């Protein structure tokens, strides 16, 4: 089961009406990286999380904090 960051990434992307490919392009990360992050198959590295947070208009803290 994907971890909390993976779930948040997917939810934020879907709330913005973006496909994984569109979100990856917006965040300037590899498409497969985003797929792996959302599925929990890759650990979230801070530089990548920072790019995605900026693209989604949220803080890094919002992505990494546990609910």
Regions found by a protein language model. Give the residues of each.
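A short, Lys/Arg-rich alpha-helix, primarily the initiator
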Residues: 1-15
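Residue-level signal for the short linker/turn that defines the boundary of a DNA-recognition helix
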Residues: 7, 17-18, 44-47
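Residues within the helices of the helix-turn-helix
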Residues: 10, 21, 32, 50, ...
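The alpha-helix within a helix-turn-helix
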Residues: 13, 24, 53
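Residue-level detection of the helix-turn-helix DNA-binding "recognition helix"
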Residues: 14, 28, 39-41
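Short alpha-helical DNA-recognition segment
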Residues: 18-36
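DNA major-groove recognition helix of helix-turn-helix/homeodomain DNA-binding modules
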Residues: 28, 47-62
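Short acidic/histidine-centered micro-motifs embedded in hydrophobic/aromatic stretches
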Residues: 66
């Amino acid at each position: 089961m994907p971890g909390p960051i993976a779930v948040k990434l997917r939810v934020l992307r879907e709330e913005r009406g973006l496909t994984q490919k569109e979100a990856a392009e917006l965040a300037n990360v590899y498409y497969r990286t985003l797929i792996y992050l959302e599925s929990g198959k890759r650990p979230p590295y801070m530089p990548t999380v920072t790019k995605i947070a900026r693209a989604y208009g949220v803080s890094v803290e919002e992505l990494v904090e546990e609910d």
